[in-house]
Amino acid sequence: MATDTIAGDRIRALAGRGPPGIAVCVAGPEGVRAAGADGLADIAAGVQASPWMVCPWLSVTKLVTATAAMRLAELGVLDLDAPVFEHVPALRQVRPAARAGRITARHLLSHSAGFSNPMPVRWVHLEDQLAPGPDLFLNGLLARHHRLRFEPGSRAAYSNLGPLVLAAAMTTVTGRPFAELVSEEILGPLGMGTTAFTYTPEMRRRAAVGYHPRLSPMRLLLPRWVIGKPAGPWISLRPFLLDGPAYGGLLGSLDDLARFLLLHLRDGELDGVRILSRAATASMRQITVRGRRYDLGLGWFRPASQRDADPPFVEHLGGGVGFYNLIRIYPSRGVGVAVMGNATSYHIDAVARLALAD
């Protein structure tokens, strides 16, 4: 099916006073139905935004982590319902110890393990800075945030710690570094050639600049070495990488995110490559545990405020300093939408809804 272009003026109308640059696509099982972009990927250089610009995916990465975990489960390598304690030495610091010993991969996938959610705004480094190793990073985090808030499985509470623990378990059971595992099991087979945990030369050429409101108080929390030059009402950000890949470290294009969206719209198969069974793909969208802010499935979530949405949807957001992204599926309609923008915050829900309404 031919892909329609979403006109730039329509995208700008959708975004309102949105990010400097934005890219949107709408897809169904047959493929991408429409895609487009508007604005600037780099204000200073005058580079136009496009579906091929590369942005940090931030927490949209969690859905890729979840998909990789489900694949390992189907391969018989990862037991979703067995405690992960023996696979993750850092969990020995967590209290109460009895609760920590009951945490399973299923709990980690559904954000129902009981972890708190510390602010990750400083969990970043520049490309030329030395990053902490995954074990050292996780050990340090759990030493500081070691108390579980509730019994695993009793409710959901979104946390950036869970995916890091899950990645550690995945590394142990496979004997493969997490980034390598995701590349070989998900990104490579799906042909997502401009998505990775570090910039390739081609990705660097396509990289969008992130922007944060110049007068925002949150600017005071940012590491000084991330802050770039002013650009009108914005402050630019220097290209950064995340210390914990599994919770938000992927970098990639909307074009590649559309391929990942199609994988889930096509029940786990894309271009003749099956990553997950139909049953496993559907189970990821099934809401199993409720929380105050989000209700969770095995990767996908639904805002608690949207429990009665018609039509119902599941999604994952990727928000952080400088970028804001979304991937959403309406299962009953068999359609999905993906949005990427290079600003900390904008009306992304309105963009997604109006893009689908077109």
Region locations from a protein language model:
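Short linear capping/connector segments at secondary-structure termini
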Residues: 40-42, 83-92, 122-127
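Short, well-ordered beta-strand elements
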Residues: 36, 315-316, 324-343
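Short, surface-exposed loop or secondary-structure junction motifs
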Residues: 32, 96-319
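Short, conserved catalytic-motif segment at the N-terminal edge
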Residues: 2-57, 77, 144-146
